[in-house]
């Protein structure tokens, strides 16, 4: 009986212990995601896409508040409407990840800013902080844009991590008038439950593998000097009322629809939630291109009307 009890205890305690160790070692990688290089081939492909819709690209460099150099592009529409859209890519990606979205906007007369997020692509920055520093980066980008272009309107569009940054950036800077956010995370801690649950069930991340989440977040806070509770698009949309179009990919296992639903419930401003049947993580444009185009352009044309 004692032997059986020891076996049972080992079976019960080993997975949480292993999860805690894994979380401890995963934290540095979480803050230092693999960079997707901005290769000459990718730049040529992007340029071809811009030329196809009449866009004109130029380099755009911004100095962040902590001194990091953020690199990206301004892309001007052939028939500009004096509104600019900041396009934010996802984790482990770079500005190329939102080129297809930019094509839609450029055709409609929107000028677009595509920046590599800190610690991504060609931008500097010691760590990715998922909105803690990036919201200030967004403000620096807007400062530089306003100084050079005097835009009539500024909007934002983001994918995954970029969606979270766009929402947090808009909450902190009222010059960003409205946000389209596809596959956003509700909070850093809530996203860690999905990560710890192996993209199978967040319940695993909250129970059996909870030590992974605890150690990942705790060590991340220690290494980066941020408070995880302060990295929350869900809280951000409750701080300032601004229009949001939330896009949820129905088959998303990385950041399931509950994240967008929580943000929708918390949002104080005009809001709309579009659930895209069959779409995987950040693939709404690929699954329903015409509807994506219609909804995004309609939203930016009259953000406050989106209820």
What is the role of each PLM region?
Residues 169-226, 235-236:
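Hydrolase active-site cap/lid region
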Residues 91-104, 117:
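The serine-hydrolase catalytic nucleophile loop
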Residues 4-8, 13-63:
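An N-terminal hydrophobic leader/cap segment in hydrolases
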Residues 104-124:
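Conserved alpha/beta-hydrolase
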Residues 287-307:
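Catalytic active-site module of serine/aspartate enzymes centered on a nucleophile-bearing elbow/loop
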Residues 239-241, 246-248, 252:
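Short beta-strand/loop motif that positions the catalytic acidic residue
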Residues 253-259:
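Conserved alpha/beta-hydrolase "acid-adjacent" motif
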Residues 97, 128-149:
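Alpha/beta-hydrolase active-site loop
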């Amino acid at each position: 009986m004692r032997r059986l009890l020891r076996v049972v205890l080992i079976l019960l305690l080993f997975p949480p212990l292993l999860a805690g160790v894994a979380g401890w070692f995963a934290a540095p990688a979480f803050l230092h995601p693999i960079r997707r290089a901005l290769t000459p081939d990718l730049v040529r492909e992007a340029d071809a896409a811009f030329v196809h819709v009449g866009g004109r690209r130029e380099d755009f460099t911004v100095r962040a508040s902590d001194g990091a150099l953020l690199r990206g592009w301004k892309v001007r529409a052939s028939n500009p409407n004096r509104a600019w859209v900041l396009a934010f890519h996802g984790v482990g990606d770079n500005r190329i990840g939102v080129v297809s979205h930019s094509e839609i906007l450029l055709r409609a007369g929107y000028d677009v800013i595509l920046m590599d997020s800190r610690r991504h692509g060609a931008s500097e920055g010691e760590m990715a902080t998922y909105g803690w520093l990036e919201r200030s980066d967004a403000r620096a980008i807007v400062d530089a844009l306003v100084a050079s272009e005097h835009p009539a309107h500024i909007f934002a569009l983001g994918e995954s991590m970029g969606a979270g940054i766009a929402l947090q950036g808009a909450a902190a800077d009222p010059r960003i008038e409205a946000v389209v956010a596809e596959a956003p995370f509700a909070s850093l801690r809530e996203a860690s439950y999905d990560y710890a649950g192996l993209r199978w069930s967040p319940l695993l991340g909250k129970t059996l593998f909870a030590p992974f989440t605890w150690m990942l977040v705790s060590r991340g806070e220690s290494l980066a000097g941020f408070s995880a509770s302060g990295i929350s698009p869900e809280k951000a949309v409750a701080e300032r009322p601004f229009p949001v179009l939330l896009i949820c990919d129905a088959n998303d296992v990385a950041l399931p629809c509950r994240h967008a639903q929580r943000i929708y419930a918390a949002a104080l401003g005009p809001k709309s939630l579009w659930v895209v049947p069959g779409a995987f993580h950040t693939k709404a444009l690929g699954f329903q291109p015409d509807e994506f185009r219609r909804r995004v352009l309609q939203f930016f044309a009259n953000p406050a009307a989106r209820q």
